[in-house]
A protein has these predicted regions:
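Conserved catalytic motifs of ABC-family nucleotide-binding domains
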Residues: 157
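Walker B catalytic motif
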Residues: 165-166
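Conserved ABC transporter NBD signature motif
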Residues: 63-71, 83, 115-124
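ABC ATPase C-loop
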Residues: 153-154
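ABC-type ATPase nucleotide-binding domains, specifically the catalytic core motifs of the NBD
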Residues: 18-19, 37, 59, 75-77, ...
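The feature captures the beta-strand-to-loop junction immediately N-terminal to the Walker
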Residues: 40-42
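A short, flexible loop at the N-terminus of ABC-type nucleotide-binding domains that lies
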Residues: 2-10, 14-26, 33, 57-59, ...
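Conserved ABC ATPase signature
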Residues: 136-140, 144
């Protein structure tokens, strides 16, 4: 059962890519433990900017982001990973010249000794990767690359995963597979914030949803 005690909170977040040009203008968001939260809205509304701001890729110029009450605003990516926050971008989310196994090992750069334990749990969710360990990521289909990217994030043993449009550019069948897998990941105990253009499918699998419009 989902526990709605706050795990991650964005409180009045103001952020943008250029000084004085704010894309987000005071956004509030709460993620509970074991919860899957969707963020939908039109193109250019600031959805991707929000998850990038949470992950420290876009500077937070106002408001605060907290994880279990700790201010994590503007922390570096490696500091957030160490605190259990993972991020899967929409594009360039795998290393195309590396094999699937090498991509997964990149998710363990902080804890390389945990390979045996983590790979076993990841392959329970992504069994098809077991036979693809030596395949270069760049030769995989779009759906397979997305699964590999999510798998690598799970190798970090995160408490929170930020997903930026995981279904973008995929066939309807692969979109369904991605959405089903996202729900399974959440049901395994990982809290998820998912930005998504496919509002209907997003809201079907999410516990709650936010609509973002013009920041």
């Amino acid at each position: 059962m989902t526990e709605f005690a706050p795990l991650l909170v964005a409180d009045g977040v103001v952020a943008g890519y250029l000084p004085g040009v704010d894309i987000l203008k005071g956004v509030d968001l709460t993620l509970g433990r074991g919860e899957l939260v969707g963020i939908i809205g039109p193109n250019g509304a600031g959805k991707s900017t929000l998850v990038k701001a949470i992950f420290g890729l876009v500077r937070v110029g106002g408001g605060v982001v907290t994880l279990e009450g700790e201010d994590i605003s503007n922390l570096a990516a490696h500091e957030l990973v160490a605190r259990g926050v993972g991020y899967v971008p929409q594009r360039d989310n795998v290393f195309p010249t590396l094999t699937a196994e090498e991509n997964l090992r990149m998710g363990l750069y902080l804890e390389p000794e945990a390979w045996d334990e983590r790979i076993a749990s990841v392959l329970e969710l992504f069994p098809h990767l077991a036979g693809r360990s030596s395949q270069r990521a760049g030769l995989m289909s779009g759906g397979e690359r997305q699964m590999l990217a999510m798998s690598r994030a799970l190798m970090m043993n995160p408490r929170v995963i930020l997903l930026d449009e995981p279904s973008a550019g995929l066939s309807p069948a692969n979109q369904d597979l991605v959405f089903d897998t996202v729900r399974q990941i959440c049901d395994s105990g990982v809290s998820i914030i998912m930005v998504e253009q496919n509002a209907r499918r997003c809201l079907q699998i999410c516990d709650r949803g936010y609509v973002l419009d013009q920041g």
